[in-house]
Amino acid sequence: MSDSLVVCEVDPELTEKLRKFRFRKETDNAAIIMKVDKDRQMVVLEEEFQNISPEELKMELPERQPRFVVYSYKYVHDDGRVSYPLCFIFSSPVGCKPEQQMMYAGSKNRLVQTAELTKVFEIRTTDDLTEAWLQEKLSFFR
């Protein structure tokens, strides 16, 4: 059923980049920012970052346009364990054009399935993206 809502396909090059990103060996935070290419009706890579904090990442996101982010985050659990969850963040700022909002919302599920992600979050303003916010969200996954 969700396939009928798909607006945009995922660029095959992006699919391969996401696959490699999933298996990266580095232990720093990293992000892939993606956008919808309206002309091609496709989700494409916009930028890739290494060693980027949540606060730095939010500075890279447009305040008035939606974006998709896959974020590899070094998460230190309360008991001292360290994990590197892959988080999908849908930045859908208030005030976006409705047609743009629909295109991103309709493409989100396909992208999440393609990237095989389970930690899926949404922000309505880039200011929401902080280390505290991310840690709070991740605390639900033990």
UniProtKB/Swiss-Prot annotation:
GO molecular function, one term: growth factor activity
Any single GO BP term: negative regulation of Arp2/3 complex-mediated actin nucleation
PROSITE patterns: ADF_H (PS51263)
Leader sequence residues: none
SMART domains linked to this entry: ADF
Keywords: Acetylation, Growth factor
Residues that bear N-acetylserine: S2
InterPro entries: ADF-H, ADF-H/Gelsolin-like_dom_sf, GMF
Tissues/organs with expression: Expressed predominantly in lung, heart and placenta.
Residue span, ADF-H domain: 4-139
Domain of life: Eukaryota
GO CC aspect terms: cortical actin cytoskeleton; extracellular region; ficolin-1-rich granule lumen; secretory granule lumen
SUPFAM superfamilies with a match to the protein in the record: Actin depolymerizing proteins (SSF55753)
Record's keyword annotation contains Acetylation: yes
Keyword Acetylation: yes
PANTHER family found in the cross-reference section: GLIA MATURATION FACTOR GAMMA, GLIAL FACTOR NATURATION FACTOR
Family recorded in the similarity comment: Belongs to the actin-binding proteins ADF family. GMF subfamily.
Name recorded for this polypeptide: Glia maturation factor gamma
Record organism: Homo sapiens
Gene that encodes it: GMFG
